[in-house]
Amino acid sequence: MASPKSSTRPNQENQEPQFQDFFPTMAGKLGGEGLIEEICKGFELLMDKDKGVITFESLRRNASTVLGLGDLTDDDVRYMINEGDFDRDGALNQMEFCVLMFRLSPELMEASRCVVTEVIEEEFYRH
């Protein structure tokens, strides 16, 4: 998972948490499927076991105990949930979490864009 640099508190300049991006290294070592498996394991660590989604409460609790991010404010936690909550149900399902993790990694997003472009070009030129 993306890892906080020194704090996840928004900085004054852009008001977004800053993260150190370990995904490209993980992808290189684990491969695509291995990376997805690790992201899914991260989801399981943070989710509410009864509801099967990451809720405000489960993220607040598990970010502190599992990830050691005890200095997160309620606003930090809300921001993290809202950033990936596409269906606006107030929680992150596994797909939303995986998409969010990829969105937080500019290098992986660029690599994905290149792969999609190659596939489209191959299909276009084959027909």
From Swiss-Prot:
| Record InterPro entries | EF-hand-dom_pair, EF_Hand_1_Ca_BS, EF_hand_dom, KIC/PBP1/KRP1
Protein's UniProt keywords contain Glycosyltransferase: no
Q: Where is this region: Disordered?
A: 1-20
Cross-referenced Pfam families, in alphabetical order? EF-hand_8
UniProtKB keywords: Calcium, Metal-binding
Question: Could you tell me which residue ranges the EF-hand domain spans?
Answer: 72-107
GO terms of molecular function? calcium ion binding
- Listed binding positions for Ca(2+) are 85, 87, 89, 96
> Its biological function?
Potential calcium sensor that binds calcium in vitro.
Protein's recorded name: Calcium-binding protein PBP1
Name the source organism.
Arabidopsis thaliana
Gene that produces this protein: PBP1
